């Protein structure tokens, strides 16, 4: 889908660049495939802020998206493509041959009327699901499982994909968008194709108010705060913080490694950080 620009009737319209969503379905979602969703304003179950600068925003209905695709060898027809306010990608409503409906992540080049299917050995075409071990080397995939039967976790954002680059016994080697190469079990499934809406990276929000509609509040820098509020706060006049950048809790930021999951290090063949050196 193309990008859409607007006449400069206001400063916000002048800067605004949006994705043209005119080809998407304009009605309401299927009710049985939706749930109510409470806005938590960045607070956790104890009421403490866990994500700063969240709050407000338009009310959203959660669409239940099927990331597992466990209905094997039953063809499904794509009924329509829809906008989903809870994610950057578009979603597709599919209807199985037995009448059941489901939402899936819409891959690029998936059109209304196409047929998709999940199975051990299926055609390599967008929207079909099969185990990674049965795919040819070089296949572009998304919604990749990391644990057998858990459902897709990797490459679910707009325009993202991973690529199958090799095999190693029961495992396959997958290259991610970040440059990381990783071992994933061959029985883990993935959906063929890249995720829809690749132009999402090119949009321009246009004005502060549109960011508020998305549920983000103004982001305050530490150097404009008082010393009680942030390690960079205080000083007479404008200062640069006087130290290497830290979080509000005094931990180094801007590049310090925070990964602590050592048990899965053996599955990472090439780190995403190695690529940048």
From Swiss-Prot:
Keyword Ribonucleoprotein: yes
Annotated SUPFAM superfamilies: Nucleic acid-binding proteins, Translation proteins SH3-like domain
GO-annotated cellular components: large ribosomal subunit
Family membership: Belongs to the universal ribosomal protein uL2 family.
GO molecular function terms listed in the Swiss-Prot or TrEMBL record: rRNA binding; structural constituent of ribosome; transferase activity
Entries under PANTHER family matching the protein: LARGE RIBOSOMAL SUBUNIT PROTEIN UL2M, RIBOSOMAL PROTEIN L2
Role according to the record: One of the primary rRNA binding proteins. Required for association of the 30S and 50S subunits to form the 70S ribosome, for tRNA binding and peptide bond formation. It has been suggested to have peptidyltransferase activity; this is somewhat controversial. Makes several contacts with the 16S rRNA in the 70S ribosome.
Keyword Transcription belongs to the record: no
Protein name: Large ribosomal subunit protein uL2
Sorted UniProt keywords: Ribonucleoprotein, Ribosomal protein, RNA-binding, rRNA-binding
HAMAP family, A to Z: Ribosomal_uL2_B (MF_01320_B)
Subunit structure: Part of the 50S ribosomal subunit. Forms a bridge to the 30S subunit in the 70S ribosome.
Gene Ontology process terms (BP): cytoplasmic translation
Residue segments, region Disordered: 226-277
Protein origin, superkingdom: Bacteria
């Amino acid at each position: 889908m193309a990008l859409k620009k607007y006449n400069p009737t206001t400063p916000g319209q002048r800067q605004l660049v949006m994705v043209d969503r005119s080809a998407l379905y304009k009605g309401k979602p299927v009710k049985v495939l939706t749930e109510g969703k409470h806005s938590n304003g960045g607070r956790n179950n104890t009421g403490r802020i866990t994500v700063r600068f969240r709050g407000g925003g338009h009310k959203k209905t959660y669409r239940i998206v099927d990331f597992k695709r466990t209905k094997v060898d039953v063809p499904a027809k794509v009924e329509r493509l829809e906008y989903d306010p809870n994610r950057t990608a578009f979603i597709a409503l599919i209807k199985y041959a037995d009448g059941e409906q489901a939402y899936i992540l819409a891959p690029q080049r998936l059109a209304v009327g196409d047929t998709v299917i999940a199975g051990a050995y299926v055609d390599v075409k967008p929207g079909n699901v099969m185990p990674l071990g049965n795919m040819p080397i070089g296949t572009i995939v998304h919604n990749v499982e990391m644990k057998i039967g858990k459902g897709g976790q990797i490459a679910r954002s707009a325009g993202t994909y991973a690529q199958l680059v090799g095999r190693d016994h029961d495992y396959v080697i997958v290259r991610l968008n970040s440059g990381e190469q990783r071992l994933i079990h061959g029985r883990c499934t993935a959906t063929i194709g890249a995720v829809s809406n690749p132009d999402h990276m090119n949009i321009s929000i246009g004005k502060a108010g549109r960011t508020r509609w998305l549920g983000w509040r103004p982001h305050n820098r530490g150097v404009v705060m008082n010393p009680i509020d942030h390690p960079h706060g205080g000083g007479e006049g404008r200062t640069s913080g006087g130290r290497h950048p830290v979080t509000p809790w005094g931990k180094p930021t801007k590049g310090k490694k925070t990964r602590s999951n050592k048990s899965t290090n053996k599955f990472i063949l090439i780190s995403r950080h190695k690529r940048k050196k």
